């Protein structure tokens, strides 16, 4: 037991004398109420993301010029990976461009993102963590 006591003493786990404190019922209630106020909700801690991790990643903006409707899935995949996308539709026929925008609008809606028209054939699609501020007006509107 001597070796065990020395090891416990080295680790700071040696037997210590405990002093009992007497508290009143009111003090115990105050402690319980204050401890309930200090405890955060469990659901809040589940969504914690280290700030430094986001800072190192940065935001990558993707530029796309689809030529076919099938390219819309690649654009949607970028949005799913939380990357904002600028889509230039000037190389696509008008009916195909409308289908692509319809597809991307559904994707953006499902991801709680945003889509805005910034030119005649240019759209910006963003996931939920990117905000678009301001508007671009055309020369004809002025």
From Swiss-Prot:
Keyword terms of this UniProt record: Cell cycle, Cell division, Cytoplasm, Septation
KW Glycoprotein (keyword) present: no
UniProt-listed Pfam families: SepF
Signal peptide boundaries: none
GO CC aspect terms: cytoplasm
Any one of the GO BP annotations: FtsZ-dependent cytokinesis
Region described as Disordered: spans on this chain: 21-46
Protein location: Cytoplasm
Keyword Cell cycle tagged: yes
Source superkingdom: Bacteria
Protein family according to the UniProt entry: Belongs to the SepF family.
Function as written in the Swiss-Prot or TrEMBL entry: Cell division protein that is part of the divisome complex and is recruited early to the Z-ring. Probably stimulates Z-ring formation, perhaps through the cross-linking of FtsZ protofilaments. Its function overlaps with FtsA.
Record-linked PANTHER family: CELL DIVISION PROTEIN SEPF
UniProt protein name: Cell division protein SepF
UniProt source species: Brevibacillus brevis (strain 47 / JCM 6285 / NBRC 100599)
Gene designation: sepF
């Amino acid at each position: 037991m001597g070796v065990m006591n020395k090891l416990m003493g080295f680790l700071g786990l040696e037997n210590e004398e405990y002093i009992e404190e007497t508290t009143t019922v009111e003090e115990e209630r105050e402690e319980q109420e204050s401890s309930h106020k200090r405890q955060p909700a469990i659901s809040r801690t589940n969504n914690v993301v280290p700030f430094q991790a986001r800072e190192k990643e940065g935001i990558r903006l993707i530029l796309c010029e689809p030529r076919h409707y099938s390219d819309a899935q690649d654009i949607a995949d970028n949005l799913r990976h939380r990357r904002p996308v600028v889509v230039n539709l000037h190389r696509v026929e008008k009916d195909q461009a409308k289908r692509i925008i319809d597809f991307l609008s559904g994707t953006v809606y499902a991801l709680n993102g945003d889509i805005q028209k910034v030119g005649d054939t240019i759209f910006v699609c963003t996931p939920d963590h990117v905000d678009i501020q301001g508007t671009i007006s055309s020369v004809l509107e002025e």
